[in-house]
Amino acid sequence: MKFKTSPIIYLISKKKLFIEFMRFSIFLLIFSLIFGFSNAKEFHIDFSDEGMKLLKKRGFGKKTLYTNDQDDKGWYLKAEADGTATGLGMEIDKELLKEMPFLNITFKIEKDFDNIDQKTKDGHDWAARIMVGHGKKIGAKLVSLAHSSFLEEGFLQESPWTKGSRDYVISNDKSGEWHNRKINVKELLEKTHGISFTNFIAVFSDSNNSKQKIIAYYRDIYFSSE
């Protein structure tokens, strides 16, 4: 004797199967949002009280004032330069760029320079910049990833002060708001100096040449694999 499946029972079973499928799909979505399926790697510069202990002052003469603070988005660094030229930096592993060639930078400019010519020695100051490269006393090969209100993004030059240093403008933002940039620093260092590594990173806000006062902020600075 053959038994036929009731249409009602068939519909109920199909509905249960659909509900279970949707539950599983939602679980996968939540899992991917929380944990992600990416193998992306990141190395962050820490501006917390503990992280600040790892940053060393770089430069000579009258010192730029650097202070850290936090808001609802986390820790940030404030830089105030008034005829000063020093930075904060740390040594990093030379192998880092092999896995994490990208540098992510978020900053904002509260008070910028009046009209200066950053292509000359007298105007060669930057409200906000990140320095990378082969840092050493003799024969250094450096790149400054800089903000400029006077030069276009993508502008690249040899520093008027130092043959082994390059200035690369990554931001021309004049909004006064937080903004972020991502740069493949491994490719940039290969292009400018023929090296594919950096042994340090430093934030550097200076105004010693123009003798003007500037205020800038940095946050969320990190190397990443993608």
Where are these regions (language model features)?
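Bacterial N-terminal signal peptides
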Residues: S25-I34
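Extracellular beta-strand elements of beta-rich domains used
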Residues: F47, R219-F223
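N-terminal secretory signal peptides that target proteins for export/translocation
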Residues: M1-M22
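Extracellular beta-strand ligand-recognition surfaces/modules
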Residues: D125-I130, K163-I215
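Extracellular ligand-binding interfaces
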Residues: E110-K174, I214-Y217
